Every structure is written in structure tokens, then in C-alpha cells.
Amino acid sequence: MWEVRYHPAAEDERKELPIKERTALANAVEKLQRLGPGLPYPHQSNVEGVKRGQRSSSLRELRPRAGRSPWRAFYRRFGDVFVIGAVGPEAQVDKRKFNRAVDEAIARLDEVEEVVS
């Protein structure tokens, strides 16, 4: 079983989701725990258009309901642990807030990487 952790700010964002979306995200996290990097598309994917440096290119998005949820959890792998850095809307739902969530995830996960390195 793979370990999945939330950055504290991402945990706060998760708590703000409607209950059905929190449940869908919990189910997606459970799949990530079971399958780790073997979790196939459409349950996860690379975040497209992220070109802010080598570390940020490894940013992934967890896609609840196989991508049918309007929410995403943005994460990165650190060894045997996945850390969710932010929770935000899907890009086609709200591009501005999606970009903000991606930027926040990158910044938070870069901080985590500095601590674990």
C-alpha cells in the first residue's frame, strides 16, 4: 500500500469541497494508495502546460470519478510517498482558479522537497 499525505493547506481545501466531491476524492486517493504509480489514466494524468522548472514537470493530477469530477488534487511523488499539494477545479471548469491551484501546488511541493532532500 502506497502512502498518500495532504499538505496542510491542501487538506483545508479538501474540507471545503461539497460532501459528494470529498467522497469522490477519497475514492481516488484510495485507488492511488492501492496502485501507486501504476494508477492508469483517466484516474490520474500529468498536468499539461507546466513548464516552471524541472521539479514542477513531475506534477500530476488525481482525477476523481475518472475525470468526470469538476475537482482535481495536484500531487507529486517523493520516494514511496505521494503528497497532495493543492485541491482545485478542473481546467475547463475554471481556468484561472485551476492555474492558481497548480501554482500553489508547485510552491507547496517545492517546499516539501526542500525539507525531504
Indicate where each model-derived feature is located:
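Basic, Lys/Arg-enriched alpha-helical interface segments
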Residues: M1-P70, F78-F82, P89-S117
